[in-house]
């Protein structure tokens, strides 16, 4: 499965548009508590613990996106957009969402 942020794939023709697909992942409040406890990981203004959690959430969202595209018979997702949003009372959760257009490539 090809997943790309571009609207098309060079050298490949889109033969069918299957529809919009999306995947989401939410990091809960406990993750933030753990992250703040791990602030000692900070090197050069970056937290390795926080970055690992964001990467894991992004991978989950993209995996869900891929699974939904496969269910529609697609072999690629184009125009993928990743969004990050703070949710919940006291901003205790972070949502990572991925959306794009499932397509069939020639």
UniProtKB/Swiss-Prot annotation:
Pfam families listed in its UniProt record: YbjQ_1
Family: Belongs to the UPF0145 family.
Species whose genome carries this gene: Delftia acidovorans (strain DSM 14801 / SPH-1)
HAMAP family: UPF0145
Protein name according to UniProt: UPF0145 protein Daci_3728
InterPro entries for the chain: UPF0145_dom_sf, UPF0145_YbjQ-like
UniProt-listed SUPFAM superfamilies: YbjQ-like
Source superkingdom: Bacteria
């Amino acid at each position: 499965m090809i997943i790309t942020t571009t609207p098309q794939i060079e050298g490949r023709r889109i033969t069918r548009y299957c529809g919009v697909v999306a995947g989401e992942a939410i990091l809960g409040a406990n993750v933030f508590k753990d992250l703040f406890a791990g602030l000692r990981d900070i090197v050069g203004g970056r937290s390795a613990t926080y970055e690992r959690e964001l990467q894991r959430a992004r991978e989950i969202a993209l995996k869900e996106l891929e699974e939904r595209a496969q269910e529609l018979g697609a072999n690629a997702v184009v125009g993928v957009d990743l969004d990050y949003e703070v949710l919940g009372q006291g901003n205790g959760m972070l949502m990572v969402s991925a959306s794009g257009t499932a397509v069939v490539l020639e």
